[in-house]
């Protein structure tokens, strides 16, 4: 009978264990698999938590796929039961909520990088186009993130009336438009450029400035303002 030996995490050298590495070097020093292993806490009889984490990431194609995996899909992986699957789903949901709760601290947005950073971790994983607006006051503080519409895989429909009705209700001074491209490529389409120009002109009429339109891709973005497209 063949015998295969596996080190448990407790049997690893202390400097190689994920929790110890996090404490010594900070959370950003850990790989995706190591972070996931901390959530999983244990593996199976034949695999460590890190091995199991690598299997999960491989099965779902990395973090992006894992973020969209449901409870039943996670439990289809050997070694992942109700507790582990719930912990993974809860961790991703907390990350998404933290990434898009501006009303709790009202950040100031002065650059395209700051605007994109506010919504990136939530919008980059959507499998349909979502159109949002960052609603700003006169000091560029975010009053709200308005979720204006949900479209299809490659398009979204936005009516100026709906966009500016909510902005006026919140006494907005300006807006930053944001939407995602599920393909991961943030390059603007001709329709994106046309819509931006139309909404910019509508904003001029009602007295609410459209400062930018940010297109979110897979951990990258395009600012139509920086590109000189409106």
Curated annotation (Swiss-Prot):
CDD domains: MPN_DUF2466
Gene3D superfamilies: 5' to 3' exonuclease, C-terminal subdomain (1.10.150.20), Cytidine Deaminase, domain 2 (3.40.140.10)
Family annotation (Pfam families): RadC, UPF0758_N
Key words of the record: Hydrolase, Metal-binding, Metalloprotease, Protease, Zinc
Coiled-coil annotated spans: none
Residues holding Zn(2+): 179, 181, 192
Motif (JAMM motif): 179-192
Residues covered by the MPN domain: 108-230
Official protein name in the record: UPF0758 protein Daud_1467
GO MF annotations in UniProt: metal ion binding; metallopeptidase activity
GO biological process: proteolysis
Species name: Desulforudis audaxviator (strain MP104C)
SUPFAM superfamilies noted in UniProt: JAB1/MPN domain, RuvA domain 2-like
Family: Belongs to the UPF0758 family.
